[in-house]
């Protein structure tokens, strides 16, 4: 879950606590949720890897993002790891990118560009740094079939690092 603490009087002790988001799988898993950061626009940015599965509100209801989609990995349309942006209160929730494996620590630069790393599943032979172009599918699994990089497919590359991200499908 994502817990939001507020210090109203500046004494470095929380005066209130709110469960902003719940239902996220992968607790204590390196493919689960990662740190929340503020962007220069004052919004929260965070991500989870492919163990995150879904995100729900404080009451346990599925989050519906600004595109009108339920935020989960059931391929309708999202799958695998995702990166998000929302207001401090959780409103205006956006799914900025999806179909990552183990995307790690989203970062937002002073221009508002979003960056993160994503790594493979066979000894780091396919690690990549992503510029997160908003609303993109980043290809860890095949978009139409959901197949992984080990599955036979048209134009399969000979080298493992080139297979991971379906760049030649």
Model-found features: residue ranges?
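Beta-propeller domains with acidic blade repeats across secreted/periplasmic ectodomains
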Residues: 1-169
């Amino acid at each position: 879950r994502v817990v939001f603490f507020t210090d109203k009087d500046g004494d470095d002790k929380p005066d209130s606590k709110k469960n902003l988001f719940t239902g996220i799988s992968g607790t204590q898993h390196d493919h689960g949720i990662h740190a929340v950061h503020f962007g220069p626009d004052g919004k929260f940015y965070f991500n989870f890897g492919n163990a995150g599965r879904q995100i729900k509100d404080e009451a346990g209801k599925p989050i519906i993002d600004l595109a009108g989609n339920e935020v989960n990995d059931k391929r309708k349309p999202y799958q695998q790891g995702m990166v998000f942006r929302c207001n401090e209160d959780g409103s205006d929730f956006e799914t900025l990118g999806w179909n990552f494996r183990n995307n790690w620590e989203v970062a937002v630069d002073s221009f508002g560009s979003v960056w993160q790393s994503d790594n493979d599943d066979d000894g780091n032979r396919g690690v990549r740094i992503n510029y997160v172009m908003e609303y993109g599918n980043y290809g860890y699994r095949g978009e139409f079939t959901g197949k992984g990089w080990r599955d036979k497919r048209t134009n399969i590359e000979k080298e493992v690092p080139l297979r991971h991200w379906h760049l030649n499908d």
